[in-house]
């Protein structure tokens, strides 16, 4: 579960290393984001000489969470870290590569470009 002030690793090569969630999109009173949800975040750590700089406000989709995600078949999937992929207004990733595994639920949320770039889909 991702909420405001949560730090996330960035799982792509957009130039950001760490982001901090400042808003969960999808309703006025929405508190938590899970895998596949879009958040608004601020870049807290970045790679030098890249497109994204510190203190830049970006949109991102959550691809991994430490909190378990329960599937319809009863299986629970849980990752080692909280991670997100930076996206643009249309929902396409800003980077050209995605690092680490992503959940299959992203395909249901129409983030097929992120799923196709990922090395492993769980």
Curated annotation (Swiss-Prot):
Protein localization: Plastid, Chloroplast
Domain of life of the native organism: Eukaryota
Coarse class of the protein's main subcellular location: plastid
BP GO annotations: translation
Keywords from the UniProt entry: Chloroplast, Plastid, Ribonucleoprotein, Ribosomal protein, RNA-binding, rRNA-binding
Keyword hit for Secreted: no
NCBIfam families: rplN_bact
Family that this chain belongs to: Belongs to the universal ribosomal protein uL14 family.
Oligomer status and interactors: Part of the 50S ribosomal subunit.
Protein name: Large ribosomal subunit protein uL14c
């Amino acid at each position: 579960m991702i909420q405001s002030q949560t730090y996330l690793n960035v799982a792509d090569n957009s130039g950001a290393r760490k982001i901090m969630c400042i808003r969960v999109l999808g309703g006025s009173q929405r508190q938590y984001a899970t895998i596949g949800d879009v958040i608004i975040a601020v870049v807290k750590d970045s790679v030098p000489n890249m497109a994204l700089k510190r203190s830049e406000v970006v949109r991102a989709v959550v691809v991994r969470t430490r909190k378990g995600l329960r599937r319809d078949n009863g299986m629970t999937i849980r990752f080692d870290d909280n991670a997100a992929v930076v996206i643009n207004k249309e929902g396409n990733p800003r980077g050209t590569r995605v690092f680490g595994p992503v959940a299959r639920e992203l395909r249901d949320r129409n983030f097929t470009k992120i799923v196709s770039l990922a090395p492993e889909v769980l």
